[in-house]
């Protein structure tokens, strides 16, 4: 089943990547959707890895996860800084807003997502808003 979902999820991730790479005039970025516990962005190889469980959480959350990893590249390519700094969070919020998504954070990771009307559309298991 997961292999089928990876095949389903990858084109969605690639479309998001292409949109953001073109909008921000970034160097090419490769993207993989894998059966792994967490995702990452690797600057030297220009590779993003997205866990398939993020897709299984729903399309809005999957978009947010992919945009989170792409935010790392925008931040790095424009400021040469790594990690979850203020500029990174600004970029991530801007990208999410472009899809009508409003993040609610626990530190720098999502604990919930709302739509631009304020409706809760995703909540991490074990959390309240």
Specify the residue positions occupied by each region the protein language model found.
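Active-site recognition of the HExxH zinc-binding catalytic motif
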Residues: 64-76
């Amino acid at each position: 089943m997961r292999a089928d979902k990876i095949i389903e999820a990858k084109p969605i991730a690639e479309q998001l990547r292409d949109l953001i790479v073109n909008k921000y005039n970034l160097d090419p970025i490769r993207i993989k959707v894998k059966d792994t516990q967490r995702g990452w962005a690797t600057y030297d190889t220009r590779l993003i890895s997205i866990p398939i469980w993020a897709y299984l959480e729903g399309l809005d959350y999957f978009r947010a996860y992919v945009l989170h990893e792409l935010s790392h590249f925008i931040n790095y390519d424009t400021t040469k800084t790594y990690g979850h700094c203020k500029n990174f969070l600004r970029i991530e919020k801007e990208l999410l807003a472009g899809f009508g998504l409003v993040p609610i954070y626990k530190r720098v990771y999502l604990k919930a997502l709302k739509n631009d009307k304020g409706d809760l559309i995703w909540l991490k298991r074990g959390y309240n808003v």
